[in-house]
């Protein structure tokens, strides 16, 4: 029986991946450290496997070599016949799928935690591709309780179409941790320490789940993706303005109709023309310029999360 997201079996095969983007340095250096010092990832019921996801991009200190690895874990790419001309990240995605998957099968890892940094002022943010996943909701709530001085928000992002494509989608369940702001190619000590502590708390939560702890019901706020907004551009694609100073660094804060979002190079303000309040995130993220994204929009909703029952003694036994 597979330990799928809604199942009642312990999570024994866990991976922590860093360097999916080779210039997001907290995950890069944590993965490198743990590969040499894996004891920090050990818990009584499991030992998480550290993985440096994109070693070529990491060596070059670039987001990727040929294409974004974190957009490459679709069944089309994973199931394609390998050729010498394949982009590096397609080859690497297939290797990672063999190591941690195969995606969509009972042989896949139980859980992948994928580590990222952003240049945007998001603070700590968990990204879940599975809407209303009770395990991930309880995980986020646990982090909020364990780290009251570091707000941790949950962003629900369901990719367009029907298939997920991220690194953590290879496992039966998974989540991405974003921490910012940190410039590309730079390692900031306070963010390195914060990410390290959050990974420890996530592994502690999995251990408590495996040991049969019951987690009570609660209410929480989540941010649900509403799409993206591009920069103002000329017809040939060049920017004609940039993110307004009133919006810059205000991730997860309310953006109301009529408030400025861009400052044109000619001096005029561009105002938000939506008909309701939204909550922007990944504002002016450096890596998203090529994706024609100035920021993402989200709606903040409050949800009631049911209790996560404890596992039965028989199901908590390790093999």
Swiss-Prot record:
GO molecular function, one term: hydrolase activity, acting on ester bonds
Transmembrane parts of this sequence: none
Stretch list, region Shielding domain: 211-318
InterPro entries per record: AspA/AstE_fam, Aspartoacylase, AstE_AspA_cat, Aste_AspA_hybrid_dom
Disulfide bonds: none
Cofactor: how bound: Binds 1 zinc ion per subunit.
Cofactor (UniProt): Zn(2+)
Membrane topology listed for this record: Peripheral membrane protein
Chemical reaction(s) catalysed: an N-acyl-aromatic L-alpha-amino acid + H2O = an aromatic L-alpha-amino acid + a carboxylate; an N-acetyl-L-cysteine-S-conjugate + H2O = an S-substituted L-cysteine + acetate
Pfam family, one: AstE_AspA_hybrid
Primary enzyme class: hydrolase
UniProt modified residues of type Phosphothreonine: 318
UniProt keywords, alphabetically: Cell membrane, Cytoplasm, Hydrolase, Membrane, Metal-binding, Phosphoprotein, Zinc
Subcellular location: Apical cell membrane; Cytoplasm
SUPFAM superfamilies according to UniProt: Zn-dependent exopeptidases
Binding site for Zn(2+): 21, 24, 116
Ranges for region Hydrolytic domain: 1-210
EC numbers: 3.5.1.114
GO CC annotation: apical plasma membrane; cytoplasm; cytosol; membrane
Main localization, broad class: membrane
Residues that hold substrate according to the record: 63, 70-71, 178, 288
Annotated family: Belongs to the AspA/AstE family. Aspartoacylase subfamily.
Summary of subunit composition and partner proteins: Exists as a mixture of homodimers and homotetramer, both catalytically active.
Protein name in the entry: N-acyl-aromatic-L-amino acid amidohydrolase (carboxylate-forming)
The species this protein was found in: Rattus norvegicus
